């Protein structure tokens, strides 16, 4: 299982996504790729924050009709076990003086709960969290 971080999905939604990201995703088995509910929320927020217009509508369609359905049965929730993992991740990061955002800690907690890997374009926070 590999969780795709929000920045990977954002990259795939660009008009001209990074060839290396597209190539990497294409080499993976679809059944091994997952999203978290946090990524859904972050993508939807990013789109909702745009001014109303064609770009916002196009991104909404691209996500809701294109990307989102591809993961319909592969979306991981934040549950009670993830809340335990979240608390540990944040506490350990604080003790070490490492910055770990709420969003990264929430996604990291889901990753830990399901014992999977994370694919991200920003490895720093996740490496610092021991993922």
Task: Label every PLM stretch briefly.
Residues 37, 122-123:
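Short secondary-structure boundary segments
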Residues 1-39, 47-66:
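Short, well-structured N-terminal submotif of metal-dependent ribonuclease cores
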Residues 45-51, 69-121:
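Active-site neighborhoods of divalent-metal-dependent phosphate/nucleic-acid chemistry enzymes
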